[in-house]
Amino acid sequence: MELSDILASFHASNLIPEGIVACTILLVLLLDLVYSRTCHAWLAWVAMAGLSLASVLLGQQWYQLMNLPTATMTFGGSFQADSLSLVFRAIIAMSCVLCILLSIDYVESTGTAPSEFLVLIATASLGGMLVAGSNDLLMMFVSLETLGLASYLLTGYMKRDVRSNEASLKYLLVGAASSGLFLYGISWMYGISGGHMELNSIAHAIVSLDETKTTTCALALVLMTVGVGFKVAAAPFHQWTPDVYQGSPTPVVAFLSVGSKAAGFILAVRMCTTLFPSFNTEWHLIFTILSILSMIVGNFIAVTQTSLKRMLGYSSVGQAGVMMIGMLTDSPDGYASLIVYLLIYLFMNLGAFACVILFGLRTGTDQIQDYSGLLARDPFLALCLSLCLLSLGGIPPLAGFFGKMYLFLAAWDAGQYSLVWVGLITSVVSIYYYLSVVKIMLVPATQEMSLAVREYPRRAWSLEPIQPLEVGIFVCVLGSILVGVAGNSMVNLMTITMSQAPSLGV
């Protein structure tokens, strides 16, 4: 076989988007080395351009795959570029683009070098994209650790901030423990399967195991679920979430809440549908428990929080439980609803964090009571934050309502009645704490303004001067509205996409 034939057999073109992200990382490092401080103003735009190009190419690959099915296995089966992976890789890349846009003003205000932040967040995005397509145990673990290590460094980006250092240490310790358990689980699967690395090969090898080895496989499933639960911030593996969310730089928290969560969910889907299809009952039971626990713990504890970042942290735990409902339906409709809700969540959650960043830059606080009377000082910020929070709560006619509706309908059709009822009840609880923040912001009485808002610079409705952060807020709010309006069409499109994903087997 000639070299050209060998290279063609790798189907390396499927990894061009990841190659572009890697080249973008190297370009940012090179520009910072050559031009130093003179390039700081436009380094972020270079990084966003590279990640945006990767997103566009992923969209093009998805379109080609839908119209003309091609080989999706890359590098000897270690990477699978099927329709499922293409969608999740695009979501992770888009979340990174938006997080960089939201971070420009924040990083500038700290006086730190933007190149470090950009390289780390792009590396985390690259790791997440590789997780989305990983099809063997080695690729899965290395990609997951690429995402994890970059995330640990991002949480400690503010080196002189004690809270940031504390958050980074907690995240590192809990992450290392969960990674160790995950690695222990995949090592068991490697041994039991007779030395296979590819997920499909392992799945075929464990179908006809004796009772002892079947029990070992079930234990491996539990161990690997711990690693997944950590990534998606699901209860009871959520203990790191509130402290890391409160102590880390807010743009980093925004990425962890969407990009890392998306990578965790595609990992869970790959693990359950490709690696453990013969343990369908077991993984359904495990993730049903995680879903119910996450929705109850996340939403009820969020009610008691006084910090908006901590509240959003516990909210993300509850949202993880809601997203698991889509996975537990084990149908194209359910997976499609999960993807559409994740896309809606991307915009509304990043929009909420963008508003927190902007308010924090102008006041230096993230306490909920300090938002009191914000409408009188900054109507744009108050309105945008209100829309994002109400959408997260699932208030109609906002996008979050339609996202949850599609998930609950798919679950109801699949017979998951208990999950739907728990989801509905905890959604009502979430509406309470989201509305409490909105009420605080919209009180008209001047005497009820917090000290932070009284000293807040009055902002008029104008386009000049407009900051990148304000552009990001507008994009997130607009994105959540548009996805909500086109929700039914997107669910239908994603249902067709998921039905063509061979790894799902649905």
Curated annotation (Swiss-Prot):
GO CC field: chloroplast thylakoid membrane
Subcellular localization: Plastid, Chloroplast thylakoid membrane
PANTHER family per record: NADH DEHYDROGENASE
Stated name of the protein: NAD(P)H-quinone oxidoreductase subunit 2, chloroplastic
Main localization category: plastid
EC identifiers of the protein: 7.1.1.-
Source lineage: Eukaryota, Viridiplantae, Chlorophyta, Nephroselmidophyceae, Nephroselmidales
Keywords noted in UniProt: Chloroplast, Membrane, NAD, NADP, Plastid, Plastoquinone, Quinone, Thylakoid, Translocase, Transmembrane, Transmembrane helix, Transport
Oligomeric form and interacting partners: NDH is composed of at least 16 different subunits, 5 of which are encoded in the nucleus.
NCBIfam families according to UniProt: NDH_I_N (TIGR01770), PRK02504.1 (NF002701)
Species assigned in the record: Nephroselmis olivacea (Green alga)
Role: NDH shuttles electrons from NAD(P)H:plastoquinone, via FMN and iron-sulfur (Fe-S) centers, to quinones in the photosynthetic chain and possibly in a chloroplast respiratory chain. The immediate electron acceptor for the enzyme in this species is believed to be plastoquinone. Couples the redox reaction to proton translocation, and thus conserves the redox energy in a proton gradient.
TM segment ranges: 15-35, 39-59, 84-104, 113-133, 137-157, 172-192, 217-237, 249-269, 283-303, 339-359, 382-402, 418-438, 471-491
Molecular functions (GO terms): NADH dehydrogenase (ubiquinone) activity; quinone binding
Catalytic activity: a plastoquinone + NADH + (n+1) H(+)(in) = a plastoquinol + NAD(+) + n H(+)(out); a plastoquinone + NADPH + (n+1) H(+)(in) = a plastoquinol + NADP(+) + n H(+)(out)
HAMAP family: NDH1_NuoN_1 (MF_00445)
BP terms from Gene Ontology: ATP synthesis coupled electron transport; photosynthesis, light reaction
Topology of the protein relative to the lipid bilayer: Multi-pass membrane protein
